[in-house]
């Protein structure tokens, strides 16, 4: 039951973060230890992170590795605790292309259909985009 409370708080953070066009993400604390990054380079996805006593949970890893690194930097400005989980809400690139930056994360969590999509035709298209990242 306690876990559901945190899921609700994370979803609230996602609600308050929007899709926007800007240069640098802005970190906003929307609740105690719950942060959202608004704005970013190019098409921006919602990115939220929660700092618990054990570590950090990140929701959606951004549209590029460069943007994902900005998320990591924002986390490190708040805490040095380990990043335990990265959650992908769905398979679109603006929510998953930053996964590679979080490869040292304990676990990347997503619905099984996200994995199926990334392993199927959508994943082949994603792989071509991944190859273009430096």
Language model segments and positions:
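Positively charged n-region of N-terminal signal peptides that target proteins for export
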Residues: 1-6
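Short glycine-rich loop/turn motifs that provide flexible caps or phosphate-binding loops at active sites
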Residues: 7, 32, 97
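Active-site HxH/HxHxD metal-binding segment of metal-dependent hydrolases
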Residues: 73-134
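Bacterial N-terminal signal peptides
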Residues: 7-17
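Extended hydrophobic/Leu-rich segments
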Residues: 9-11, 34, 88
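Boundary at the C-terminal end of the N-terminal hydrophobic targeting segment
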Residues: 20-22
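Conserved beta-strand hairpin/beta-sheet module of binuclear metal-dependent hydrolase folds
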Residues: 26-74
